[in-house]
Regions:
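A conserved regulatory-domain signal marking ACT and ACT-like small-molecule sensing domains
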Residues: 280-389
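A conserved active-site cap/scaffold subdomain adjacent to cofactor or substrate pockets
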Residues: 238-291, 297-304
Length: 389
């Protein structure tokens, strides 16, 4: 068994869903379980539609969402009923929000859940029409039980139920990412990028051979390739190094997903949709440990805070001063005073002031608080200092 997770960018449109179908079919012999996010932009659109509905103006936003999904279904050769069934109840929920005039956290989760619900049904139907039997799975009903902290629920997975739900599917299970249900059966969400967590929970419950996380980048690089195009791809990482990258702002894999997979001994392989034949990056306990500075992570100004407790105090300090973090990740024995001093010199010489610095308790990363407008320059300076060929 393998688990294949596809984010919103991968299922953004009919062409993307066709690529997903081809990738899943290529792995059919390995008994894939698929986890999908909502179509790109659908979650934000649903959140906005919920607020609009509470203000008495949600009908147009809901209609636009349904129309977008219907258009994708049409391009895939699927009947409108696939989308209409997925969105059944959304218009009624919007009318209820209009009457109440506010969006309670529980109702917000119920509203936003329609994104993953529609995506899973579109992908399952696209697989079926391409000749591969598939069925969409309600993650909460399938065993992703959570607490009732709506919007950022903590999973308390029922592994036996998850295995039974997967086994009951005559074909490829397509699981709604990001979603769960609390003990009362109410829909909950796992927080931003929570589909990674869903995928890791299923990989752990199933004892999967590997968890494939399919992205628009072909693996984990030594620095963000949008900032440093020549940054080299990292072939393998220990989970602790991947977690240190996440603490420094990397959004490649959700840190909770890294932790769940590592605890279960399931390797994560980050693969690129645009280059499916490439090896990607393998995150596993048997990966060689770093021997020096390995990578540079950074916060992306304007993004929500990184979903990890690492560097929380430093990040808050930086935010209070209009700043963000850039960090060095590597061997704890390497990231000592000399490296920190060299990094500070490189930043100062390049005109990037440092507000403060801190390191992780295990010494696997050191981060610097710098002005948000200078984050990308800081990444380039540190890459040139430590990682340039």
């Amino acid at each position: 068994v393998i688990v294949m997770k596809f984010g919103g960018a991968a299922v953004a449109d009919a062409a993307g869903i066709r690529r997903v179908v081809a990738l899943v079919q290529a792995e059919r012999a390995r008994a894939p379980v698929v986890v999908v996010s909502a179509l790109a932009g659908a979650t934000d659109a649903l959140l906005a539609a919920a607020d609009a509905a509470a203000a008495g103006a949600g009908e147009q936003a809901v209609a636009a969402l349904v129309a977008r999904h219907r258009a994708v279904a049409g391009e895939l050769g699927l009947p409108p009923a696939v989308v209409d069934d997925a969105f059944a109840g959304l218009a009624e929920l919007a009318r209820g929000l209009r009457l109440v005039g506010a969006v309670a956290p529980r109702l917000r989760d119920e509203f936003v859940a329609f994104g993953e619900r529609a995506s899973a049904r579109l992908v399952a139907a696209a697989l079926a029409i391409a000749g591969t039997a598939a069925a969409a799975l309600d993650a909460g009903a399938a065993g992703v039980v959570t607490d009732d902290r709506f919007g950022a629920a903590t999973p308390r997975p029922d592994a036996a139920r998850m295995r039974a739900a997967v086994a009951a599917v005559a074909g490829v299970p397509v699981v709604e990412g990001f979603l769960g249900r609390d003990a009362r059966g109410f829909v909950t969400t796992l927080g931003r990028n929570g589909s990674d967590v869903t995928a890791a929970l299923f990989a752990a419950a199933l004892g999967a051979e590997e968890l494939q996380v399919w992205k628009d980048v072909g693996g984990v690089c030594a620095a963000d390739p949008r900032v440093v195009p020549q940054a080299r791809r990292l072939a393998a990482l220990p989970p602790a190094v991947a977690l240190a990258l996440a603490a420094c702002g990397s959004r490649i894999v959700h840190p909770d997903a890294l932790a769940h997979a590592a605890a279960a001994g399931v390797p994560i392989v980050v693969r690129g949709i645009a280059s499916p034949a490439a090896a990607g990056t393998r995150i596993a306990a048997d990966a060689p440990p770093p021997t020096g500075v390995l990578a540079i992570g950074h916060d992306e100004p304007g993004d929500p805070p990184a979903p990890t407790g690492g560097f929380a105090a430093l990040r808050a300090n930086a935010a209070a001063r209009g700043g963000a973090l850039v960090g060095l990740i590597g061997a704890p024995a390497t990231l000592g005073g000399l490296v920190v001093a060299a990094a500070a010199r490189a930043l100062a010489t390049g005109g990037v002031p440092v507000f403060a610095a801190d390191s992780l308790p295990d010494g696997g990363a050191v981060a610097f608080a710098v002005p948000a407008a200078s984050v990308r320059r800081a990444v380039t300076l540190l890459h040139d200092c430590f990682l340039a060929a």
